[in-house]
């Protein structure tokens, strides 16, 4: 009888389990007439964008629950290729990278999942999520039908599918939609490539899996595939009807969705912390929900770009800070902000049930008293001698120095060294320069460093060449024969947006020295100007990771340095560097200290007295620091701390003012410590356009959207001056969101080499509204003058070299009515710079 009862119970349990699984698999999600359909009924997607690599795994569920308490019914996630395949062919979906577990946690908490598997994701993430090792193939064509690129993409997507295909809705999981590529219209026009990505995803997830592609209202038609759902991306304050107008004309019966509604914005080093108003965000979402428009709020919770994962923007080079707070409703450390509560109040209107309460934070916020990092190991202790021993021939090169990628290094630093000849008698094509002339003929070092180069001669600091500032030259002192030129290059995050994502690190090409130097290859003579190219380099890797830092301290214990000098072993010789404040080895290196805790909690370690580099706590890579700001603290999750002793290591490539650190309860995300101005107008500089003849003048139309103007005839020049004379809003300030110049065929000219030569006025007090916003590839950011500064206003663009142009395109702000849009204008073009 007992056996019979046991058998019956087992049978009932099996039937119950089977029924539960069957119930899950009966859910359906589809694209219907003007709406999405969940189980055959109209469904508005209310998604929260969150990124699992930016949240410590122990906090995943808390962040999901915070999104749920806002009234969201889904989470939207990118899949970061370079997190999962950091070395070619070596995949990791465990621990912090267990994206399948993240999806299961979402389902556990009643949330659906939208997956955006790239291969490119942007996200202000290193190389837009593409792995650096792709660049070991120098001629690779990224985000195109390059055979090697597509081969690796398909392998990666298949590996992701092994994790996530079992979790689609039809298989009882939470995944309802999958995105094809990402904002491809801002990169180019290539439907065959986008189609191949679509076909790859369909082969993995099935023909019935709803697929969509996202872009901007201005470019979505470039690559729109007929069999995919089209969604729009735009930010707070945008004119929502305008954003969907063209989509409605082309597909009147399609559901509308804003797949990225930008709640805030990202920060870059050397600029103020970005914020966006809560009212604009809430009103925009309210308007969309009232019209049945689905959305994903990017970001609902931003988190942190731990380690070296923060990317960089382009044109130019604008590296992102470690914090990805994004001014989102849920802040970097998982706390509800005023935006959160305002949004929650509005979202309650669209729920027939009371929204769940916000969950309790998993950790308290704690302070840490000041402590000093007393241990020091010089930078050369981090040299990768093992790699040098195995690949010495590669690292001792004839010709150009090696990039990081050429020596199989993704992140870190490289020390480049070469011997210098003597300034002396040089004869070339009738030009004779004597030692007595050395003060008249200063030497200039010319190089392209990606990204932060410090230059030394025999270990003595000469100066810095910073890619962020667009610097490529440095004056050198008089040189003696046999001295050694050393260039220490730190690579920051690779560019994540636009055509510049093919962002090699290190020295790019061959540095040259212009001046009176002999003994190198003579590459050109122009009157008394002689240019030489070094042809022998030593390239020393300094990888960026915790293990290297630990080895540096182990080496220090075995071979302690003194305060008098440091012996630096080299291949074939030993160099001795004096321990001086300007020396290569003084201050630059690894620092270690400890602090004790009686209670564990989240905290923000303050590094405002430090220089530039990376930080590790208990072996976890926290991220980058840089004294210029605006970020001065790093978020330390309490789950990475322990009661008792905790270790802090700082790799500082510049050197600290003070070796102290402390933990505070709130972050410092908006403290700039800049040496120079943040605007593009020098003190006392006034533009003089008298006598200049405009190539075009007229009036722009009022309202939103791109406008195109053609010149009467093609014009050629390097410098473009945009002069704004009045505003449609009858106020005394002007705004421009984006600006393109057109070539002779009417196509947009590349803006990669553009810089701002002058701007009469820039609003940097209420936000980062500098003039370079007019060519930053972002339609939601803009240049603005300050209130009360009278017309006319002017911006001068330096395109780098002469270009022949047939016209231009202008985009006003995206908000309804295009606030402060320019009315009357004049345009000037010159090959030479304008007068001041």
Regions found by a protein language model. Give the residues of each.
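N-terminal carbohydrate-binding accessory modules
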Residues: 22-74, 104, 600
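Active-site neighborhood of glycoside hydrolase catalytic domains
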Residues: 149-225
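Aromatic- and acidic-residue-enriched segments that line the glycan-binding/catalytic groove
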Residues: 89-97, 108, 118-144, 194-198, ...
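Aromatic-lined substrate-binding rim segments of carbohydrate-active enzymes
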Residues: 60-126, 198-206
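Short beta-strand-plus-loop segments that form exposed binding edges in beta-rich domains
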Residues: 487-493, 650-656, 723-730
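Aromatic-lined ligand-binding clefts that engage carbohydrates, nucleic acids, or primary amines
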Residues: 427-456, 485, 595-618, 625-626, ...
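Catalytic-core region of carbohydrate-active enzymes that cleave or remodel glycosidic bonds
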Residues: 204, 237-331, 335-338, 342, ...
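Aromatic, loop-rich ligand-recognition surfaces of beta-strand-rich domains
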Residues: 685-691, 699-836
